[in-house]
Design a protein with these regions (language model features):
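Basic/polar N-terminal segments that are highly enriched at the extreme N-terminus
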Residues: 1-10
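Conserved small-residue-rich beta-alpha loop and adjacent elements
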Residues: 9-47
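A structured beta-alpha segment of the ubiquitous adenosine-cofactor-binding alpha/beta core
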Residues: 18, 56-107
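Short glycine-/small-residue-rich Rossmann-like dinucleotide-binding loops
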Residues: 22, 67, 91-92, 118-119, ...
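Short glycine-rich, flexible loops that bind phosphorylated cofactors or substrates
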Residues: 26, 94-96, 122
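Active-site-adjacent "lid/gating" segments in soluble enzymes
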Residues: 32, 36, 98-183
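Glycine-rich phosphate-binding loop and adjoining beta1-alpha1-beta2 segment
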Residues: 35-66
Length: 183
């Protein structure tokens, strides 16, 4: 992230985003920011199979790192020093255990916008549970409501909770935080 990508254009051109997001809404949020010109670097775990959707994966570079190793953590810290935005979608406490939580990174880079997204929030009875669209619609009863007259429920093809709720609200929150930072 030390060299600007001069081929990018759009209102977020020059904005540097570091993505530790995994699957679903995090990569979708990063895609939205990249579509508006941000320079996005996705940190992919070693041995990971990557996000399988080339549409959602567009507009970014990928770096493979073992962020659990000392070298991977140090490289991540260096990248965060040069970033404007960080996106992460791990369960609560994961980034803190790795030494990459918001307190640690904001101490080193006070201008960093730390975009954190979890399915159930950072605290509460479901905080440590995995959060995925299918869980939300099952828990709320929406999945049962969309089944036919007989047979099992059929999950919808679109992931409204992950993409319509998670990624869009994270993108709006990041843009609002950037606006506030620059005022």
């Amino acid at each position: 992230m030390n060299e600007h990508d001069d081929t990018r254009s759009g209102p977020l051109c020059g904005l540097r985003v570091l993505e530790f997001a995994g699957i679903g809404p995090g990569p979708h949020c990063a895609m939205l920011l990249a579509d508006m010109g941000a320079e996005v670097l996705r940190i992919e775990r070693e041995g990971g199979n990557g996000w399988p959707n080339p549409v959602v994966d567009r507009g970014r570079k990928t770096l493979t790192l073992d962020i659990r190793s000392v070298a991977g953590r140090e490289r991540s810290l260096a990248l965060a020093m040069d970033a404007d935005v960080l996106i992460e979608g791990f369960r609560p406490g994961v980034m803190e255990r790795l030494g990459l939580g918001p307190d640690e990174l904001l101490e080193r880079n006070p201008r960093l916008i730390y975009g954190r997204m979890t399915g159930w929030g950072q605290s509460g009875p479901l905080a440590k549970a995995a959060g995925h669209d299918i869980n939300y619609i099952a828990l709320t009863g929406a999945l049962a409501a969309i089944r036919g007259e007989s047979g099992p429920a059929i999950p919808p093809l679109n992931l409204v909770g992950d993409f319509g709720g998670g990624s869009l609200y994270l993108a709006v929150g990041i843009l609002a935080a950037l606006w506030e930072r620059e005022r």
